[in-house]
Amino acid sequence: MKTAILTFQFAHNYGALLQAYALKQYLKSHDLEGEIAPYYPDWAQSEYAISPFAKGISFRRRVRLASQYWKRKGQSEVFDKFISEELDAGDTFSSELELKKWLETHECVICGSDQIWNNNITGNGGAYFAVDCNVKKISYAASLGTTQLNETQKSNIINYLPSFSSISVREPGSAEQLTKILHREIQVVLDPVFLLDRDEWRKLSRPVSVDSNYLFLYFLQENEKLLECAKKYAEENGLKIYEVHPTLATRHNGCKRLENVGPKEFIWLIENGSCVCTNSFHATAFSTIFRKKLIHIPNSKSPERTTSLLERVGIELKTDKEFPFYDISLCDDTNLNFEIEKSKKFLDAVMESEQYGN
């Protein structure tokens, strides 16, 4: 069955690209042709622009991009290479009309994963609901990004989701909200990165030349307390601190920032670090997959994304530590394996239903 995947395949963001890769690979392993929609809306092109001559950006940002261009160029090219080679993203388009036409060349569209239904990111349109498309629609691990729905989100849910044959989301709080509004069953499933096992991720990963004993630091939101925790843990355990940022926007004293790190290197750095310190959802997810020691404070904009994940897979905070520490290496895999199988069964069942019209 020719299946479209509607997600954030354009983002210069480790988690966004790796979840898209995982869903595409999982479908491929089940003999389903999963093709990622090459939709690259104008807001996203502006968001991820590195050229000072890009459209739709302010004068102040043009000046900043001009000063940063050569520093960011190599990092940007690493992401573009992954998008081209691993996601098979072809020529992009930006209009919703072109998206509609493209989706309708497929038998089914999977909306998700990532925060595709967070209108604070995507704007107020219905593109990521595949609105007005004459095609079968399901969602897999879509995220609203919050449990406090705004009026636009409520309106989108009421107007666009009834046409979906099956709906699954990533966070339990989102499922509760959708159930109240739609009065139908909403499944909670894990992010697509959990559809692939450790060995599959190891095959994709690429080594980085670093010291063998290190703490891996990855922030998408500045957090002074979390940084202090990382430095204290590293000092107590004789670890060097390596950090990455997808746009090279930050650099912290006492940390070695690595540049030109793509999604493949990101996986390797998490698996091989002695400890991971992060407020990122996907860095937390990969720390779970690779059973790492984890120092974690949730992102304040959407804390449920990580707290619900850790709770569902039975990972508890170590209360005997001075900082928010989780030793996933000591955790039982029972809950995680149960959630993974539940997620796979949902996806397998809905795809079979769409394929054979059950």
Model regions and ranges:
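Active-site anion-handling motifs in enzyme catalytic cores
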Residues: 1-358
